[in-house]
A protein has these predicted regions:
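Glycine-rich, aromatic-bearing surface loops/beta-hairpins
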Residues: 140-201
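Feature marks short, highly hydrophobic, charge-poor N-terminal signal-anchor/signal peptide-like helices
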Residues: 1-7
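N-terminal topogenic membrane-targeting module
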Residues: 19-90
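C-terminal single-pass membrane-anchor helix
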Residues: 7-15
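Generic structural signal of hydrophobic/aromatic residues within well-ordered alpha-helices
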Residues: 25, 29, 64, 82, ...
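Interfacial alpha-helical end/capping and short helix-turn segments at domain and membrane boundaries
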Residues: 72-158
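Short acidic, glycine/proline-enriched loop segments that cap or flank alpha-helices
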Residues: 36, 55-56, 135-142, 161-164
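Charge-rich, acidic-biased intrinsically disordered regions
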Residues: 66-69, 90-104, 169-181
Length: 201
């Protein structure tokens, strides 16, 4: 009986510690995101891409693409500023566990199994910028698909930091009906390489 009581209270303790740590992470990232309109701009972009891609008449889609350019530029600037601003945070607070589920204090107890969110945000900012420059000379339709994937992967990373990799992947599927592997395959080769080098190291 004593064993079951100990196990019960231990489970409660772990859950409470995990919840407290996740709240701290949400508050930390939220305090930086609130300076920008990233979420609003990202929704506008993805909705705009869908509208433009749904038009079969180039004359009707052209104004939509044109209107999206200023939003794309804003997202590029905000991602770069977010990555720069977060570098002022003490390193231990930005560590992210590679484990699929959240474990309290994993960033302190198992630092070798973590990566730095600050570095990851640099990868996302660079990836969006590179895709927007369109060095690969993709047609606008294909570029929009790639930019959408870059944004979805950025969202996944934010949820991974705040919750866990498993929760982030579930939210990606629930919100966009798109799997993590699909998104990873759709970003630029440079983003995919730099991303995997960091999160799988």
């Amino acid at each position: 009986m004593d064993f079951f009581f100990l196990a019960f209270f231990a489970t409660i303790g772990v859950y409470a510690a995990k919840t407290a740590e996740q709240r701290q992470r949400i508050a930390l990232l939220g305090s930086y995101l609130q300076k920008f309109q990233l979420e609003k701009h990202m929704e506008q972009l993805i909705d705009g891409y869908l509208r433009a891609l749904g038009e079969n008449d180039p004359q009707r889609s052209a104004p939509i693409w044109s209107n999206l350019e200023s939003i794309e530029a804003a997202v590029r600037e905000e991602l770069a500023r977010l990555a720069d601003d977060l570098h002022e945070v003490w390193g231990e607070r930005t560590r992210v566990s590679r484990w699929p589920v959240a474990v309290p204090f994993a960033n302190r107890l198992f630092p070798a199994s973590t990566f730095d969110l600050r570095t990851l945000l640099k990868v996302h900012a660079k990836g969006f910028d590179t895709s927007l420059r369109n060095d690969d000379q993709l047609v606008r339709r294909d570029q929009a698909f790639r930019l959408t994937a870059e944004l979805m992967l950025f969202q996944h990373s934010c949820h991974w930091f705040c919750r866990s990799r498993t929760v982030a992947s579930a939210r990606l599927m629930a919100r966009h009906k798109t799997g993590y592997d699909q998104v990873l395959a759709a970003v630029s080769p440079e983003t995919r390489r730099d991303y995997l080098d960091l999160v799988q190291a």
